[in-house]
UniProtKB/Swiss-Prot annotation:
Gene3D superfamilies: 3.30.1360.40, Ribosome-recycling factor
Domain of life: Bacteria
Keywords: Cytoplasm, Protein biosynthesis
NCBIfam families the UniProt entry points to: frr (TIGR00496)
GO biological process: translational termination
Species this chain originates from: Lachnoclostridium phytofermentans (strain ATCC 700394 / DSM 18823 / ISDg)
InterPro entries hit by this protein: Ribosome_recyc_fac, Ribosome_recyc_fac_dom, RRF_sf
MF (Gene Ontology): ribosomal large subunit binding
Protein family according to the UniProt entry: Belongs to the RRF family.
Taxonomic path: Bacteria, Bacillati, Bacillota, Clostridia, Lachnospirales
One Pfam family of this chain: RRF
Identification of the protein by name: Ribosome-recycling factor
Amino acid sequence: MNEKIKPFEGKMQKSLDSLKEEYVGIRAGRANPHLLDKLRVDYYGTPSAIQAVANVSVPEARVIQIQPWEAKLIKEIEKAIIASDLGLTPSNDGKVIRLVFPELTEERRKDLVKDVKKKAENTKVAVRNVRRDANDAIKKLAKANEISEDEQKQIEDEIQKITDKFITEVDKVMEDKSKEILTV
């Protein structure tokens, strides 16, 4: 592979990785502790991840249990969960917070699939933008006579193959997540 392409391929990989991270946060009817990854609570004036101030476990398929290390954090954690877009209502017994995931309705599943497809499309746009930037950089090199026209054409073909590979991977990740959501 041409060294001039590597930074652009890295950017495409980052776009794909970002999509995969976003998909982790989309719940598919099962309890997944990673849904809490982006939530922050105020811990002595410092925004902290829930996993950093509590023990998070999944005792049942549709229940996340959060056991804060300090009882005073229960209210903070509940506030963060309610303020998030998870659509969950926390319940607590004074020591432990439980998040019960209701069964997803057919309508909600379809909405989630639409969201999954939208995020995938945004990632494809990002990958194509990286391709455009790469092609522009190669054209500048050719214009400055740093590479020949043949090299330019070869590199552009290589960039297109890499772009196609990432677009295919985005489609595969999207299909897998859509199937996961639609599986009852």
